[in-house]
C-alpha cells in the first residue's frame, strides 16, 4: 500500500489495484501538486460537505466512473447529481473489495454553500478509518479534539494518522499533539494547514511536540510505503 499527501486534506491511497482519494479538493487549492485533468480515481472517500473537501468530487466521479463513499446526507446530495455513491454513517463499517471503511466522529460542520448564497445541510462530519493489506489509516477530516479519540486509538492499531493542525476551523498543533497521543498511531502526518492565511502553521513545530520518529511532514506529492 502507498499513501500520498497532496496538500490541504487531500490523501491518495493505492492498494489492491485501486486508486482511492480522500477529500479531493484540487481546483482552487494552492497547496496541491495535482492537476485535475491528470487525476485518476476508482474510489473517493469524503469526510464532510465543505467545499474544500468535496472539491472536485462530482467531476472526478463522473469522468472516472468512481464510487463515492460519504455520510448519508452528503452521499444522497451527490447521488442527485448523477454520482455513483455508497452512503454510510458514523459508527458503521463496510467491507469493500478494495478495503474496509469505517466512519468515526468528527466535531465540525458539513454545510455546502451554493453560488446563490444558500447553505445546504449535509449531515454530520466524519473521520475515516481505512483498512487494507493489514494496515489501517485514520483520516480525521476536519475536527476539534474530542475524548473518544482515546477509544479510536484503543480499538484500532493505526499505522498512519492524518490530523488537521491549522487551528481556527479545526484543532491547532497543541490539541493535535494530544490527539496523536490518544490515537497511538505509528506515524502522524499534519494536514489542513497553510492553504489559507487563517490556518497558517509551521508543521515542523507540530512534529516537535510528538515523540521522536512519530511525526512526519510530507510535502505535496510525497508518500509513505506501508
UniProtKB/Swiss-Prot annotation:
Molecular functions (GO terms): hydrolase activity
Transferase as UniProt keyword: no
Pfam families (UniProt xref): Lactamase_B_3 (PF13483)
Domain of life assignment: Bacteria
Keyword Ribosomal protein attached: no
InterPro entries: Metallo-B-lactamas, RibonucZ/Hydroxyglut_hydro, UPF0173, UPF0173_UPF0282_UlaG_hydrolase
Keywords attached to this entry: Hydrolase
Family: Belongs to the UPF0173 family.
NCBIfam families per record: PRK00685.1 (NF001911)
HAMAP family xref list: UPF0173
Protein name from the UniProt record: UPF0173 metal-dependent hydrolase GWCH70_2696
Amino acid at each position: 500500500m502507498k499513501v500520498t499527501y497532496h496538500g490541504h486534506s487531500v490523501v491518495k491511497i493505492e492498494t489492491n489495484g485501486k486508486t482511492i482519494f480522500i477529500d479531493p479538493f484540487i481546483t482552487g487549492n494552492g497547496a496541491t501538486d495535482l492537476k485535475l485533468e491528470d487525476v485518476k480515481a476508482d474510489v473517493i472517500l469524503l469526510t464532510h460537505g465543505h467545499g474544500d473537501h468535496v472539491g472536485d468530487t462530482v467531476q472526478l466521479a463522473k469522468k472516472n466512473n468512481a464510487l463515492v463513499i460519504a455520510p448519508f446526507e452528503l452521499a444522497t446530495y451527490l447521488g442527485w447529481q448523477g454520482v455513483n455513491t455508497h452512503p454510510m454513517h458514523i459508527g458503521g463499517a463496510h467491507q469493500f473489495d478494495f478495503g474496509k471503511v469505517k466512519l468515526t466522529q468528527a466535531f465540525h460542520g458539513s454545510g455546502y454553500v451554493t453560488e446563490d448564497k444558500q447553505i445546504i445541510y449535509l449531515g454530520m462530519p466524519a473521520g475515516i478509518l481505512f483498512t487494507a493489506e493489514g494496515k489501517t489509516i485514520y483520516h480525521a477530516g476536519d475536527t476539534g479534539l474530542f475524548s473518544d479519540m482515546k477509544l479510536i486509538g484503543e480499538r484500532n492499531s493505526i499505522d498512519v494518522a492524518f490530523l488537521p493542525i491549522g487551528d481556527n476551523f479545526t484543532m491547532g498543533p497543541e490539541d493535535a499533539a494530544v490527539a496523536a497521543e490518544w490515537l497511538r498511531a505509528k506515524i502522524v502526518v499534519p494536514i489542513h494547514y497553510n492553504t489559507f492565511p487563517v490556518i497558517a502553521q509551521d508543521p515542523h513545530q507540530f512534529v516537535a511536540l510528538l515523540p521522536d520518529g512519530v511525526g512526519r511532514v510530507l510535502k505535496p506529492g510525497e508518500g509513505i510505503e506501508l
